[in-house]
């Protein structure tokens, strides 16, 4: 049977005017700032007007360790949101915006798939409302002002060997990881080593996604540490006097983007930090606004539960003062087989033994999610190659671990295929069983926080960090940053730092290569193993097959 591509399905969508979608949420037309007919930003005035309302219930969608193609977490988020609306609940979806890097690399878009998509899919996966461009511009403005400050006399006494603010671009470009800038003579400034990260790893992105409002945004931007002096004291963004202009560039980007699903249900798509190199959650302002206008809010956290869900619980919920009522853990038969040792080219063949072996990965994630005090249901995201025996193996494994596994066919059937999952989520959310708590307290030392995540979530025996890293953490504690959470940057494919080590390994070590203080965002980034904050393109990037056809339509964008 031939199935339509995601882009073909999205083009057939019968979209409602965005003003009608806003009306479903009680947003008046003059409180929406339309970008065409099918997307709009929500005004700060409306956001302020709903702050006294009670919150709805928050549902987190996370996943097992993914295959390179992903396991349909966004697709499940969209399908569940549609399913909740189908059974009569007032539900809304909150997801992240797509980065151009993976769109043209190998992962593809971020709007869902099949009949569980958010539209307009093509615009969302490209420039959308320009938020990423605004973030890149604000980040680049600070970069330019730092070197300009040094050029015109260096009043802040910046040690040019200790400029820690890297540049960004929203593209996978390994050639920019390490560069030398200001070459070409005296008129171009003082040459120094520098480098680029991808925009989604920018501290500006994290700040936008964690800020409560424009005032909080400006303060956080001012708190960014951009460099150090010769006496090792920090130089802040506010010392360069850049935070005001950066806030101006980000003014519109701070407003959540309203769009719709294929079934005309409302969705906020706002912010986009990666979960392997950043905190992996959509914006706090979008999530908290959604909780004021919907009874159920379905959101996702990037990659597997060891990364995105851990950061959602320990960083986003802690910072925003929110808590999930239930967690949906997305699993696929093909990921079970890959974690069971099956090669990528053989994932389409039935292999119940490999499924049973790979379920150890699922079991580890179930245990980890439960450790935060939140009830969990496993969603088996159905693929056409799944066999009844393989699906039953996953069901049986989950039953033996005290959770229910629900087969969901939202990719194929839309909300009709996710109705059973939606009913189970409502049952869990309304059971009152949630007793959420982060897994470490604010006042724990920074290194102990790293160890807690490594040992309790990754099941490592030890954290390997040299004296330089340990001393740096102690210096930050003495400077008043002890209470910050830690943001682990590591591979998404494994509980270890080795992307090829599948399943549920124990007894391994977590090597810490680098630590970075994101004082504006309010967390410590811990870079583990070989993870890069500037990805590279694969041997055959998706960009090679993306083109405009003779009718002016985009082809190849999934």
Swiss-Prot record:
Keywords: ATP-binding, Ligase, Nucleotide-binding, One-carbon metabolism. ATP binds at residues 67-74. It catalyses: (6S)-5,6,7,8-tetrahydrofolate + formate + ATP = (6R)-10-formyltetrahydrofolate + ADP + phosphate. One of its GO terms (molecular function) is ATP binding. Pathway: One-carbon metabolism; tetrahydrofolate interconversion. PROSITE patterns: FTHFS_1, FTHFS_2. Its EC number is 6.3.4.3. The keyword ATP-binding applies. GO terms for biological process: tetrahydrofolate interconversion. Belongs to the formate--tetrahydrofolate ligase family. This is Formate--tetrahydrofolate ligase. The gene is fhs1.
């Amino acid at each position: 049977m031939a199935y339509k591509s995601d882009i073909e399905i999205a083009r057939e969508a019968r979209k409602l005017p965005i003003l009608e979608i806003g009306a479903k949420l009680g947003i008046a037309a003059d409180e929406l700032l339309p970008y065409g007919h099918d997307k709009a930003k929500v005004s700060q005035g409306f956001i302020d007007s709903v702050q006294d309302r009670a919150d709805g219930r928050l549902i987190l969608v996370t996943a097992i360790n993914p295959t390179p193609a992903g396991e349909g977490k966004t697709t499940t988020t969209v399908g569940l949101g549609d399913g909740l609306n189908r059974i009569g609940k007032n539900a809304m979806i909150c997801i992240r915006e797509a980065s151009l890097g993976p769109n043209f690399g190998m992962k593809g878009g971020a709007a869902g798939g099949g009949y569980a998509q958010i539209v307009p899919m093509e615009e969302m996966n490209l420039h959308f409302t320009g938020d990423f461009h605004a973030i890149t511009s604000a980040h680049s403005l600070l970069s330019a002002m730092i070197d300009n400050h040094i050029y015109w006399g260096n009043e802040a006494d910046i040690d040019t060997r200790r400029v820690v603010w890297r540049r960004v671009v929203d593209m996978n470009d390994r050639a920019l990881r390490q560069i030398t800038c200001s070459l070409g003579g005296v008129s171009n400034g003082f040459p120094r080593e520098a480098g680029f990260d991808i925009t989604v790893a920018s501290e500006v992105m994290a700040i936008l996604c964690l800020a409560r409002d424009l005032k909080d945004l400006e303060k956080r931007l001012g708190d960014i540490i951009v460099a150090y002096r010769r006496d090792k004291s920090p130089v802040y963004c506010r010392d360069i006097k850049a935070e005001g202009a950066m806030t101006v560039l980000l003014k519109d980007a701070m407003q959540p983007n309203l769009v719709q699903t294929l079934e005309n249900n409302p969705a906020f798509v706002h912010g986009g930090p990666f979960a392997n190199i950043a905190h992996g959650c959509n914006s706090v302002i979008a999530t908290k606004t959604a909780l004021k206008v919907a009874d159920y809010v379905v959101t996702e956290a990037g990659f597997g539960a060891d990364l995105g869900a851990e950061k959602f619980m320990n960083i986003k919920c802690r910072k925003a003062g929110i808590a999930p009522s239930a967690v949906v853990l997305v699993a696929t038969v093909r990921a079970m087989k890959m974690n069971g040792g099956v090669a990528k080219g053989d994932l389409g063949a039935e292999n119940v033994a490999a499924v049973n072996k790979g379920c150890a990965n699922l079991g580890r994630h179930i245990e980890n999610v439960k450790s935060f005090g939140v009830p969990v249901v496993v969603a088996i995201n159905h693929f056409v190659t799944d066999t009844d025996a393989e699906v039953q193996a996953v069901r049986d494994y989950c039953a033996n671990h005290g959770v229910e596994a629900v087969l969901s066919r939202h990719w194929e059937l839309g909300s009709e295929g996710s109705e059973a999952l939606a009913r189970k989520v409502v049952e869990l959310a309304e059971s009152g069983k949630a007793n959420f708590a982060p897994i470490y307290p604010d006042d724990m030392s920074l290194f102990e926080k790293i160890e807690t995540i490594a040992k309790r979530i990754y099941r490592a025996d030890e954290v390997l960090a040299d004296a330089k890293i340990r001393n740096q953490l102690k210096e930050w504690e003495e400077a008043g940053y002890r209470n910050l959470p830690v943001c682990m940057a590591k591979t998404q494919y494994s509980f270890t730092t080795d992307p090829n080590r599948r399943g549920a390994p124990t007894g391994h070590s977590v090597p810490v290569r680098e630590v970075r203080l994101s004082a504006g965002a309010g967390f410590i980034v811990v870079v583990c193993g070989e993870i890069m904050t500037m990805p590279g393109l694969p041997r055959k990037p998706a960009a090679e097959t993306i083109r405009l056809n003779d009718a002016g339509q985009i082809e190849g964008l999934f």
